[in-house]
């Protein structure tokens, strides 16, 4: 660095120092600036405090405004309907009592006045929190709003009707109109509105619907009540179907239109019928914990036709009531076949011939008897006698055939002695000779089974009928307090492995009597019809094993059903014993001997049997040649 540069830098430094020293503030100005800074800081703190206080006071003073702003963001046009006080609206007639809530405008409670639970308490199909009905509204401003979150206003209220109104604005609203039919279990619901184009899009054609219910336990046996609890549904103009009642969980998606959907238990049901149809149906059910206060949780979601045209409406019918077959059938009177509700299918009567027997024979007969007798023990006895009388002509032929087999037993034993041995050749000869004897005498080895075979359709039909008919519910007879449930004469609380699971923790007396009478019937009839053949000896234990199985199976079933089976076995034994006095065995034996001298045309069954025997004999000989 040269001398000139150094001198220049020194001069610049002196100039800057001199300028700063000449322009420095005096002590009075410094003090004034300090005081001004302190005051400014104080004023800033006061301003912030006042702002915070003002904000707090504003928040305390105007919470509704803030909530309204937040509500509008979520509910849009229906934001105002999210505020309100919930109110209960009661509707009632002589059959049922309902409670509706202004929040959601839906039914919250259903009481059946004429019925009690198994332990004598009022019977509710559902109460608060056990059922939900919701219409998800897809609004004009692209929001999805649930009616369950909105408050309706009850208008036009009477003891049996009310209109729940959801106001959109002063000129637009959505109505849910409820009308309880007089002395009936049905409730009409109509969805309508005014100026709906201000709420829904102009191209709207379908409205969403959601419905759910927890099925309450009403009967003593949770297991058997749950067995008949399920979601039923009817296709539009077609048949009735259901979800599985045995699966722990089941669900279906149905694209076909449905006419109605039902959440049913053993004796009662909640049904939603659409005047038009349901589409996009999703049904689901899940079994509750065994032995709890609930049976299944049922849900449905669907859509139904609804648009924004003036005067548009959608009609529905709720049914909340007992599954009385004749009453449900009466709902279809005067309707065209394609319009029938077919609610009687909610009463399970079996399939094909068994449903036919119950529908056209058992139910009309029991309905007739109820006009003259109030005791169901007597009615079941008369039904049993009627069935036995109906099949008695055919049963007599069966007893006659059994008598023939019994008279031919000594001759069959002679054939067995003539062809002893257990080799295939001896067995074929023995069987052929026995068949020839039966054919010559005019006896049929299978005819003795006819009485039991004739009873099977009625026995199975009754198995379908008694557990599901509400007519015997809480009807007592002798020691049985309720013929629709088991009649425990002895019970225990300890859980015994396998026994408690399959038999139960009680002893049903009618079930025990049924088993004893069945064993007596088997023992008596088999002793009378035993021909001494080896096949009979091998199969003689099967009926006893079956009876023991029935003892376990029916112990928790309806005592009325066990009572019927008990009567049926006793009457059958009496009929069988009576046939011994009615049938003259000496004349019958003479007729059998006379038949042997007459040429007889082979029956088709006997011809097929002999042909099968010839084929077996031919195969046996071919096998021997190969050896």
UniProtKB/Swiss-Prot annotation:
InterPro entries: Membr_insert_YidC, Membr_insert_YidC_N, YidC/ALB3/OXA1/COX18, YidC/Oxa/ALB_C, YidC_ALB_C, YidC_periplasmic_sf. Interacts with the Sec translocase complex via SecD. Specifically interacts with transmembrane segments of nascent integral membrane proteins during membrane integration. Belongs to the OXA1/ALB3/YidC family. Type 1 subfamily. The chain crosses the membrane at residues 3-23, 376-396, 450-470, 502-522, 534-554, 558-578. HAMAP family: YidC_type1. It is a multi-pass membrane protein. One of its GO terms (molecular function) is membrane insertase activity. It comes from the Bacteria. It comes from Porphyromonas gingivalis (strain ATCC 33277 / DSM 20709 / CIP 103683 / JCM 12257 / NCTC 11834 / 2561). Its main location: membrane. NCBIfam families: PRK01318.2-3 (NF002356), yidC_nterm (TIGR03593), yidC_oxa1_cterm (TIGR03592). Pfam families: 60KD_IMP, YidC_periplas. GO terms for biological process: protein insertion into membrane; protein transport. It is found in: Cell inner membrane. The keyword Cytoplasm does not apply. The keyword Transmembrane applies. This is Membrane protein insertase YidC. Required for the insertion and/or proper folding and/or complex formation of integral membrane proteins into the membrane. Involved in integration of membrane proteins that insert both dependently and independently of the Sec translocase complex, as well as at least some lipoproteins. Aids folding of multispanning membrane proteins. GO terms for cellular component: plasma membrane. Keywords: Cell inner membrane, Cell membrane, Chaperone, Membrane, Protein transport, Transmembrane, Transmembrane helix, Transport.
